[in-house]
Amino acid sequence: MKLVQVSDKKTNDAFISVTRLIYAQDKNYIPHIRQDIEKVFDPKKNKLFKLGGKCERWVLFGEKGEAIGRVAAFVNPKTVNAGMHPVGGMGFFECIDNSDAAIMLMNACKEWLVNEGVLGMDGPINFGERDQFWGLLTENFTGKPSYGLNYNPPYYQKFFEQYGFREYFKQLVFWRDLQIPAQEIFVKKADIVSSNSEFSVKGMRGVSHAKIASYFLEVYNSAWGGHEGFKSMRIEQARSIIKSMNVIMDPDILIFAFMGEKPIGFYLSIPELNEFFVHVNGNLNWWGKLKFMYQLKFKKRHTMLGIVFGVSKEYQGKGVEGAMIKYCGEVVVPMGRYKDTILTWIGDFNPRMLKVIGNLGTELYRSLTTYRLYFDSSIPFERHPVLGERKASQNSDNQNTEEVIGNN
C-alpha cells in the first residue's frame, strides 16, 4: 500500500472517486456532491484558510494501483484553541475493510497534526461548519442518507475505537410522520400562547431574504448566544446562510413565531435534497445541474429536512415550540408537498431540545458519533459539556459557535 498526498488533479480525482469501490454493493449509498467536497479544500472558497487554517489530504493506493482509502487532517483556527488543550481535526475518512490501511490513514493525520503543534484530534469532522461531513454513522445503517450527513459502513466504528478514539458526543437524527397531529402537550401550550393577540406564526413566502436573515439572527442570538462555548452570530453570517439556501429554499417551510413584530422562534427546513441528488451521481457539473433542476421542478417531493429549531430564551417552554409544530401540521401538511420530516443534528448534550423532540412523536432514525483522541494519554478525557450545565473550570474543548450554525 502507498500513501500519497493530494497535490494535483489526478490525486484529487482519486480522493473523490475512492467511494466507488467502497460502496459498490451498497444500494442505499448516495455520494456527497463532488463540488461540495472540493470547496472545503479550496482556499478561494473556504474562509478558514484566510484566517490561518491549514489542511492536508491523502489517498491510499492498493497493490494494483487502485484507490482504497482517503483522509484529511486540518487545523481550524476558530476552534483549535477553544479549550485548555489545542485540538485539530480529521475527516473525509473512507477505507476498505482492512485495519492496516485504516491505521496508515489515521497515522498520517496524527503525525501531521503533531507537527502542527496540537495535542489531539476530533473526527471524523468537517473543515468548516457542522451541517455537512460531520460524525461517524454508528447506529442504523439501513435507508438512504440525508443530504450533507455522513454515511459509512459499520466497520468504520471499530477502526476509530481500536485506534484509541473515544466518544465526545453524539449527533442524533430523528424521523417524524407529518400526518400525525401535534401531541396534546404541544397543543395545550400552543393554545395558551396563541391566546395572546400579539402572537403569530408565519411562513416566509413573499418575505425578502434580508428580512429572513434579520429574523434568524435575532432568534439565534437569543436562543444560543449566552451558552458556554457559543458566540453571537453576526448579520453577515446570517445573510450568508440564507443566501446559500436560495436555490433550494421553500419559503413555506421556513417557519417563524412572532410576538408582535419581534421574532421569537424558528423552525427552519429545506426539501430533502438527496431525493433529487440521487440522480446526479455525486456531480453537479453542467449535466448534473440540469438533471437536478429538472428533478427539483418536476419531481414530487416527500421529505423535508429540519435544519434548525430554536426559541428565544424568555419564551422557551411557553408553548412557542408547540405552536410552530401545530402550524406545520395545520398549514404546511395540507399543501400536499411533504409527508414526513427528518430532524438532523440534535446533540446529545442538549437536554432541552431532546425533551422537545421526545414530545414530538418522533423516532430515532440515526446516530452519528464525534470522536476525540488525545495524543498524550495523560490528558484527562471529558465528553462535550451539557448545555445549561456550566462547569466550574473552563477546561472543556468546546467547538466554536460558528461551527454549529444551522444545528441544534
Regions found by a protein language model. Give the residues of each.
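A conserved beta-strand-loop-helix scaffold within acyl/acetyltransferase catalytic domains
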Residues: 19-63, 71-81, 203-310
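Acyltransferase donor/substrate-recognition loop-hinge adjacent to the catalytic core
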Residues: 150-228
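C-terminal "cap" of GNAT-fold acetyltransferases
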Residues: 175-190, 369-408
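Active-site proximal loops enriched in glycine and acidic residues that flank catalytic Cys/His/Asp
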Residues: 258-259, 267-273, 307-313, 328, ...
